[in-house]
Amino acid sequence: MKYLDEYRDTAAAAKLAEAIARTVTRPWVIMEVCGGQTHTIVKYGIDEILPPSVELVHGPGCPVCVTAMEMIDRAHAIASRPGVIFCSFGDMLRVPGSRGDLLQVKSNGGDVRIVYSPLDAVNLAAANPDRQVIFFAIGFETTAPPNAMAVWLAHKRGLKNFSVLVSHVLVPPSMTAILQGAGNRVQAFLGPGHVCAVMGYTEYEPIARRYRVPIVITGFEPVDMLEGILWTVRQLEAGETRVENQYSRAVRREGNPASIKLIEDVFEICDRKWRGVGIIPKSGFKLRYEYRDHDAERRFEVDDIETQESTVCISGQVLKGLKKPHDCAAFGKTCTPQSPLGATMVSSEGACAAYYAYGRHLQSKSEIRNSKSETNSNGESGKLKTIRLGREDVPVCQAGACVCENVAADVGQH
């Protein structure tokens, strides 16, 4: 399939892996921001076929994972009330708060429904005028346009029984918070392709300049990730710090102007608390004053609910790139997708869920480290012998011709 097969091409990926190994001369720490990127890295073993000196750490780009526990408790409180229909995407139903999760509310008789679009919730409100319908509006900038459209449409149609519980968060302030945080080791970022498809990447340019970090916007296929890593390493080795767009087939510098205008019409920027991270200034969206009647926190008076987060789960440190899932003593033991202790194990985009899904809980930390330190037949460290795409191990030396002309031109002859 066009725009898919060539970005999963084994030969192209192998050539990129070898180009990275040839380019790197010193240790570098690169953070992939988005949870979708994390899953690609773990699923295809990309982190295991990189040179030992290139370390990938996982960032806060999982919207379910960073939704504050108190927001889950507010959702729990609203959904437990009689006469309401509480709507959410499915992955939010199992996220634990201090009072339990939304599935427990449903099992106790609450009307909690999974929807596939916020417009489904608007239609429910129109069909049930005698009931309050609430949509749990979480996510990064990617999901803000449809949520804004739902609010705008409900307001236009005069649906006074429709409201949204807003917990939108923004990527650029989180990157700044990571760079300013204690113990930060991140030297470059793989930027979030889906977010940038909506917002563009002008907001990332001041971050690259101020903190002197390369930022490469990437897609989500193996070749996307490896090409993004190669571009990042080239910048690091050359002492360059700029924003590059590897995901040019989907991302423009200016983003999607129509979506941005819709967001700006309905939302305004606010401070936001992130689970495991704390309050990050100007890192969220809230409804503008003219749409206040659709604010579920205001309508149900739950904005005073505050919650202390558990100290057992280390998901906050995972989200900041300070630890990895296998650093947690509970990972794969008392914390599994069936009985998660934290949001990073619940969400399909969470780093802990990715590690578990692709068998990392079956490996010891030493096995994971050793998988990156193998040498080739000539004894050269960093010259990787194989690349794994899916369940297939392909010798790098058999890379052959690249079917993706752009990649071939980028890495040169094998």
Give the positions of each predicted feature.
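Metallocofactor- and cofactor-centric catalytic cores in central/energy metabolism, strongly enriched
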Residues: 1-130, 144, 148, 154-157, ...
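Flexible, glycine/charged-enriched surface loops at secondary-structure junctions
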Residues: 27-30, 161-162, 238-248, 274-275, ...
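Hydrophobic alpha-helical scaffolding
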Residues: 6, 65, 136, 140, ...
